[in-house]
Every structure is written in C-alpha cells, then in structure tokens.
C-alpha cells in the first residue's frame, strides 16, 4: 500500500510537470542557465515557453513563485517519507538536485545567501528535528526542549550550509565521492549516537 501511494504521488507530480505549469517551469530553468535570475522577466518566461503573460500569472505570482514550485515538485516532493533514515533523506536531496544541477547551481550563485537560507531552512529544520528526537534518549530530561532546539538549530545550519556550499563550490557534482563522504559521516558519527542511545535503553 505504501509503494502504491508513492507511485500514485509520483504520477500526479509527473502530470503537473507535463502540463502548462511544467512547460513554463522548463522554460524558466532554461533561462536561468542562460542568464542571471535577476535579469529574467515574466515576458522572457512567457516567450520561452510559447505562452502569454496572462498564462503565467494564472499559475504563478512572480518568478520567485515558479522557482519555489520547481523545487517543491522536483526535489522536496520526491524526498523519502519521515519514517526513512535521515541518511536516505539527505542522500536523496542531493540525488534529486543532480537532475538539474546546472540550474540549481546558477540559482544559488545568483541569489543572496540569506535568500537561499530562508527558503530552505524550514525544510531542513523539520527533518533535522526528527533526527535529533530520534537520537535523544530518556536520560535527557533536564531542559530537554532547550537542548533539542539547540541541537536542531546547530545541525540544521550544518547540513543546510553544507548543501548550499557544496553546490556553489562545485561546477559538477561528483555523486560517487559525495556518497562515500556522506556514508563515512553517517556511519562513524550518527550511527555511534544511535548505538549509544540503544545501549542506554538496554541498561534500564
């Protein structure tokens, strides 16, 4: 049933990308790869997609709206469910970004660091909080919420900063080397935290 629902969701998202909004999204991505985000106009997007400005405003408020929609459809919506390990989520984030790496890299280089961070922070913060909650054991009871909030903010900045900086600093993504690095990070550090939590639970 889980896989059936996932397949249905992917088909729905695919239909969205093949429709009018999808055509404008593809045109927008092409434009971003050719010129800076700041210089792209709604007329440019309409012309590139063989649509009208009216078509654009029927579906989107502005170019920031279409930018957010593309990320939501092609990256965020395709991420693993919350029940899956954080490692899988973070890996999938890069994997989904790979499909249009040049586009995302141009965006990150065109926009300010604060714009990118504010756009992506909620997505990262929510998923990192689940990771932190998974790692905290029952021995952490004094100021538990404060410690959870602190840890979430720390690791959100770490993972989000790495994601942004990696794309900005690498003209091409070496996915194999990235996977090796991430596997080492998660196996040597996160797995240790989880094992410690499990051992703590067994001793009770």
What are the roles of these predicted feature ranges?
Residues 64-67:
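A secondary-structure capping/hinge motif
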Residues 79-109, 113:
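Hydrophobic alpha-helical connector segments
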Residues 2-35, 39, 44:
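Basic, helix-initiating cap at the start of DNA-binding domains
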Residues 50-60:
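Short hydrophobic/aromatic patch on the recognition helix
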Residues 146-168, 173-189:
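Hydrophobic alpha-helical segments that form the core
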Residues 92-95, 114-140, 146-161, 191:
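Amphipathic alpha-helical packing segments from all-alpha helical-bundle domains
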Residues 41-42, 70-79:
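Short, basic, alpha-helical segments at the C-terminal edge of helix-turn-helix-like DNA-binding modules
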